[in-house]
Amino acid sequence: MKKFTLFTVFIFIALNSSFGQTKAKKADYFPAYNNWQHKAPSQLMLDSAQLNKAISFAMTHEAKSSHDGALSQFQSFGKEPFSEAIGPLTERGGPAGIIIYKGYIVAQWGDPERVDIVNSVTKSFLSTVIGLAVDRGMIHSTMDTVARYVSPIEVYNPAAQLSGYNADGDMINPFSSAHDRRLTWEVMLRQTSDWEGTLWGKPDWADRPPAGDIEQYKNRKRNDPGTVWKYNDVRVNALALAALSVWRKPLPQVLKENIMDPIGASATWRWFGYRNSWVVMDGQIMQSVSGGGHWGGGMFINAYDMGRFGLLTLHHGNWNGKQLISEQWVKQALTPTAANTGYGYMNWFLNTDKKLLPSAPANTWVHIGNGNNIIYCDPDHDLVVVARWIDNNSMDGLINNILQAVK
């Protein structure tokens, strides 16, 4: 009986060991730093010819915007008041992208190593550093008012310091008005705040103002927080300044240490603010970054690093077994906004009603920036697609072509 019991235990251990090995073989693949494995589509049972069609589609459906960054910014926003660029802009490249299936690169086009402005995909990085602050208890809850965390901030103004003149404009308090004191991190993240004010020389009303009487629009009654969705980069920049106030260190450093380095991103990405968005924090001069390229600045990054970030969000914040940002945060980011069900936290565009991408599953999401620059995340197909400078009306066509290769 004793021999039988020992034999049974031995078999049980052996079987479990074998199961463990099988499980390990099936574990998700995550690329190491500077070493991302490529696999031929046929190795993963993908249709190579169809993927080639998808690449051809991407290459022939380039955005019509100018390659000259300054000219493109002017063409997009030049008719707005206070539209002058105040952050870096560069010449952009042509169409580029990568297709990531089960963690492996199975196709690419253009120059994926080229560092280009990513425009409002930057907002996804901004919401991520706020999520890190929530995970660490630095922000107790997204339902807290932002004003509780932000005190008056000194603007770095060397000209004023040299002259000895200290104007009221040298100190800013972006959440001090009666309306702004009501705003929570939640409504700021969802772009339903209707924040009022001027920041870095840009009034909130000057961003994509409606046609008609501008004075009437400027002096209108403010919407209750959470009731109306409006895409507005001044408000995004106010959120970035609030996040800087919480972290008390430059947000690019926060992102680098907690997200980009752990996922093996390159050393080539940069996150810029504006020439006039420098502040003094704890005696240190630091730049408050922008949440996009509306007036220049924001994130400049290559397609591979975009893909790594997409892979992180596809796995709900987990990278090779390490939870870099909580699954709860990703769940919140993927929760539709009441005032716009196609939007979660910035800049997670949701396909809940399949209006964004009719060809894709309803549970997909896309990090989108003007250009268009996109990071498509598809958990049903274990798929991430990075596409740069794809025509806005051609996003679904590209994804449709790729999904035909996966099915």
What is each residue range found by the language model?
Residues M1-A24:
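Bacterial Sec-dependent N-terminal signal peptides
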Residues S17-D111, R136-I139, K249, Q404-K407:
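N-terminal leader/targeting segments and the immediately adjacent pre-domain N-terminus
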Residues K23, T364-K407:
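Structured C-terminal helix/loop/strand segments within mature extracytoplasmic catalytic/sensor domains
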Residues K64, A147-T268, Y304-G307, L312:
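Active-site-adjacent helix/loop patches that line small-molecule binding or acyl-intermediate pockets
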Residues G103, I117-T142, V146, L239-A243, ...:
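Active-site SXXK
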Residues S124, T128, M188-Q191, R235-A242, ...:
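Active-site-proximal alpha-helical segments within enzyme catalytic domains
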Residues L255-K256, M260-L334:
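Active-site-proximal binding-pocket segments
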Residues W278-G291, L334-V384:
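Active-site Gly/Thr loop motif
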